[in-house]
A protein has these predicted regions:
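Membrane-embedded alpha-helical segments of integral membrane proteins
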Residues: 4-6, 12-16, 53-102
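Alpha-helical transmembrane signal-anchor/signal-peptide segments
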Residues: 132-145
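Membrane-interfacial, low-structure loops and terminal tails that flank and connect transmembrane helices
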Residues: 31-52
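N-terminal signal-anchor/start-transfer transmembrane helix
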Residues: 13-30
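Solvent-exposed, conformationally flexible loop/turn segments
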Residues: 146-149, 265-267
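Structural signal for the C-terminal ends of transmembrane alpha-helices
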Residues: 25-32, 97-104
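Internal/C-terminal transmembrane anchor helices
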Residues: 104-130
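A cross-family detector of function-defining hotspots
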Residues: 2-4, 130, 156-250, 254-322, ...
């Protein structure tokens, strides 16, 4: 329903602007002045009609860039007054470019069409946006991309998938030894139920674990399809979780974790994380706190339409007092119309 509303709104907006442009074109064609249509009538006093030279183009572009920078800084201050001031800063540069040569009603129509296309682009970005680039989780040399990497890809890369056999949980050391989990044979005997769901269980209680060379790395969740069950091999990875035990075991066996090239097994100081993730970082630990529960990073990769049209991704990294990772989660929300 959400998709239908947004797409319908954009279609109505596009039709309105198309009619507006067509109406203005017909007005310029039918309205006459001194025997000529406004479409062909000059609208300024300039008589030069040749194309702009390279030097002139550079001059006007420089003016536009300078005016645009000042206008952008003014807009960032917020407020209606600053919005009007930004337009007043930018308008003279635009008018200088417009009046550099003889212009007719045709030029005004071209400007209107350009503005309409720009306005539609702004509306598209505000309502739908563009798909975010999925973060890449790297374990040693193997890369995992949520909603793209399949269970079969993991197994081909040397990972083992374990399926939970009961309801109880086990200590980390016994997860693969006490029968709580059984190694998946890759025989298409396990299917992922239709629909999207993330797992909220702690690692020892998760439905699926994944391991490398007998070392449990964490829990993992899969998504097959919205309307049918899918065999595990063909299902996509949508969630990966590490806990303190699995992180320590990975370090002991020289297994590295990276998220978009950031080494997660190193000290994760705020400047380092900010430099690596920039706009994707939405929460950082407060400074000078002794409460270890507040030491965590929140990351997101999303568009303006949430997950209506594009997949979106989230990560939570918990730390100890030394800013070393103690818990990690990377999850995706698959694009769907709820």
């Amino acid at each position: 329903m959400g998709r239908t509303v947004i797409i319908g709104t954009l279609i109505v907006f596009a039709i309105f602007n198309l009619l507006l442009g067509l109406g203005f074109y017909l007005f310029l064609k039918k309205r006459r002045e001194n025997g000529r249509s406004l479409y062909e009538t000059p609208v300024n006093q300039q008589t030069r009609t040749e194309k702009l030279g390279l030097g002139e183009i550079l001059i006007y572009l420089t003016l536009l860039v300078i005016a645009g920078m000042f206008a952008f800084q003014t807009l960032n201050r917020g407020g209606v007054g600053n919005s009007i001031l930004a337009k007043m800063i930018l308008l003279p540069a635009l008018m200088a470019l417009f009046n550099a040569r003889k212009r007719t009603g045709k030029s005004i129509l071209a400007l209107l069409i350009t503005f309409i296309v720009f306005l539609f682009g702004v509306m598209f970005n505000l309502t739908i946006g563009f798909p975010p680039q999925a973060p890449i989780l790297q374990i040693n040399e193997s890369k995992i991309t949520l909603t793209e990497t399949k269970a079969s890809d993991l197994m081909e890369a040397g990972f083992d998938i374990y399926v939970k056999q009961g309801d109880g949980g086990s200590d980390y050391e016994d997860l693969l030894a006490d029968g709580s989990f059984q190694k998946y044979a890759g025989d298409k005997s396990v299917t992922i139920e239709k629909g999207f769901r993330l797992d909220s269980n702690a690692v020892p209680y998760a439905p699926y674990l994944f391991a490398k060379d007998g070392i449990v790395l964490g829990s993992i969740s899969f998504y097959g399809a919205e309307d049918k069950d899918v065999v595990l091999e063909d299902s996509m990875v949508i969630q990966v979780r590490f806990n303190k035990d699995s992180i320590e075991a990975a370090k002991e066996h020289a297994i590295t974790f990276k998220l978009d090239e950031l080494d997660l097994t190193s000290r994760l100081d705020v400047p380092l994380v900010q430099e690596n993730f920039k706009k994707h970082l939405w929460s950082i630990p407060p400074s000078n706190t002794s409460d270890v529960t507040q030491l965590w990073y929140g990351l997101k990769w999303k568009s303006n339409s949430d997950h209506l049209f594009w997949n979106e991704y989230y990560s939570l990294i918990r730390l100890d007092e030394n800013y070393l990772m103690t818990d990690f989660e990377l999850a995706a929300k698959v694009a769907r119309d709820e």
